[in-house]
Amino acid sequence: MRFDGESDYRHGSPEILGVLVTNLGTPDAPTPKALRRYLKEFLWDPRVVEIPRAAWWLILNGIILNVRPRRSAKLYEQVWTEEGSPLLVIGRRQAEGVATRLSERLPGPVKVELAMRYGQPSIESGLMRLREAGARRILVLPLYPQYSGSTGGSTFDQVSRVLRRWRWVPGLRFVSDYHSDAGYLDALAESVRAYWDQHGRGSKLLMSFHGVPKRYLLAGDPYHCQCHATGRQLAERLGLKEGEWVVTFQSRFGKAEWLKPYTDMTVKALGEEKLGRLDVVCPGFSADCLETIEEIAGENREIFQHAGGGEFHYIPALNDNPDHLDALADLVLRNVQGWPEANPGYDATARQSAAEASRARALGMGAKD
């Protein structure tokens, strides 16, 4: 293996703290071609689909990639904006908001980059930009509040895959999850209360999380438990009683059993009960995307009302809500403690002088630059 070095490195170069904020990803455009490229990368990840590779290759390339891209492109067309994919647009705002807050609160220099596990901007490009900026310490923050091997685990895999090719590996920290983080839960609760203050309140709050195959739970994945922990703590903050809220799981794919109860079936059952109003929030989605805008606010609304239900209210994801950005910045600050840039005594002038002295010594010993 050839390792990727830094041929343009200069002794005494200033060092900074890097933060890589990541999310799942998005196609480059709402077209079958772009969707095929995106889905191939996504669905070929062994963390996402744990099926023997040879059999899955035949299914993926022989069936799914010949059918699903056209169907998915039509769905993406419905949520695409003039700025682009909602997930990417919101992700940029989130990264900018976190960067602003960290610059105000960290004693030392920091740079925040956004990256996607699948598609662009890639994790590799994000890490490269941080390295080029002088980041010798990097915190990776996947915006998945609840950990699953298929999301956070896959992100760690890709970060490792990139860094294993670097000659000079940076200091690295990784936020596995934040499902019980007080700032995150408080931001969620406040967003629900704010929505209720403006639009009134239904008799039941449905908390829909992205689903995963049940066999992942049985194999030891903590995702199911963490979703329920988030749901319970959110309900407590909202003062909800038993029967006034329910946790469900959406977006199942294929014929295998996934985590239950299923969102669409629960929504249909509540509609058949002639529920007058249903409120839905998706605590596991840090930003609105296809799964919340089209699947929940669109498809599940139709299911509920077609079954006989009344009003259907989707409460938006936290997105770039200031409380959310504050919570994410706090999360970063706690996880970078002990690094120089987080030291209250950080002295930029002293560090620059030390760097210049180090450079002078290196040049004196024969270094070329």
UniProtKB/Swiss-Prot annotation:
HAMAP family listed in its UniProt record: Ferrochelatase
Entry annotated with the keyword Repeat: no
Keyword Repeat part of the UniProt annotation: no
Here the disulfide bonds are none
Q: Name one GO molecular function term.
A: ferrochelatase activity
Pathway-wise, it operates in: Porphyrin-containing compound metabolism; protoheme biosynthesis; protoheme from protoporphyrin-IX: step 1/1
Output one GO BP term: heme biosynthetic process
Q: What is its EC number?
A: 4.98.1.1
Question: Which terms are listed as keywords in the entry?
Answer: Cytoplasm, Heme biosynthesis, Iron, Lyase, Metal-binding, Porphyrin biosynthesis
InterPro entries per the UniProt record, alphabetical:
Ferrochelatase, Ferrochelatase_AS, Ferrochelatase_C, Ferrochelatase_N
Listed under catalytic activity are: heme b + 2 H(+) = protoporphyrin IX + Fe(2+)
- GO cellular component entries: cytoplasm
Q: Which CDD domains match?
A: Ferrochelatase_C, Ferrochelatase_N
Q: What is this protein called?
A: Ferrochelatase
User: Which locations, inside or outside the cell, does it occupy?
Assistant: Cytoplasm
Q: According to its UniProt record, which protein family does this protein belong to?
A: Belongs to the ferrochelatase family.
- Where, by residue number, does Fe cation bind? H210, E291
- The species this protein belongs to is Thioalkalivibrio sulfidiphilus (strain HL-EbGR7)
- The enzyme's first-digit EC class, named in words, is lyase
Gene name of this polypeptide: hemH
Q: What is the role of this chain?
A: Catalyzes the ferrous insertion into protoporphyrin IX.
Domain of life of the native organism: Bacteria
